[in-house]
Amino acid sequence: TFNEAYMMHTTPSPHYGIVASTETAAAMMKGNAGKRLINGSIERAIKFRKEIKRLRTESDGWFFDVWQPDHIDTTECWPLRSDSTWHGFKNIDNEHMYLDPIKVTLLTPGMEKDGTMSDFGIPASIVAKYLDEHGIVVEKTGPYNLLFLFSIGIDKTKALSLLRALTDFKRAFDLNLRVKNMLPSLYREDPEFYENMRIQELAQNIHKLIVHHNLPDLMYRAFEVLPTMVMTPYAAFQKELHGMTEEVYLDEMVGRINANMILPYPPGVPLVMPGEMITEESRPVLEFLQMLCEICAHDPGF
């Protein structure tokens, strides 16, 4: 209860570092100099996209892919059209959604464009942990995708560092190095479990669990029907303040009103809000959470 109250009444807004950064960015965007900065970011992002495609074409076996149209020569936001297949969305309205060139989404093996699962897969969470070991922070991680933002602070050196880290990961993965050598932070979470495990075994362990639960279908069903809103988040928080809550196991959530937000990370998107209740109709939400718990129980650190 204390933690919930603290998070509700505190904010990073007055943080001087954030305020200074915002003011500096606003000043940098003024006039033609700001336009040059933005154009430079777009150009670097497009060059990075093309380099990933080139490496994918020249690589033996697998390599990362980029979520983007076939033709990216124009420096503009690319529309997601209903007659295109590259984006994987169905029944969308034309001119409704666009892809920002500076938002680069890399794809790892495991899921086809039509949502079917492959026999071979490398969950993106493993790649994200490897990049973190090398000082590269991923903006958002999905099951088989990684989002990077080519903002005005990303120069050529940083883009090359990311490329080098990705190629190093492929090389280490293909050599099937030990987890403790590739992911020392993960190894320290459970040294006994990861002592002799190699990176390909770890990837296949998680990938098989995702295939077993048929993740694309599960995610579709989980977001198709939202949990039922029984009371407002404020009313749910008042219940907690007055000690009118209890802890229950995840398996017992159906028919119970949530007092707290459930927010799996990554990607950090709330699945259940305070005051909402999972019903039989929204049970896929619970099944998705159970799948995440099973992965974590099977492979510590995930």
Predicted regions and their residues:
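Conserved PLP-enzyme active-site core in the AAT-like
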Residues: 1-56
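Non-catalytic terminal extensions of PLP-dependent enzymes
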Residues: 32-302
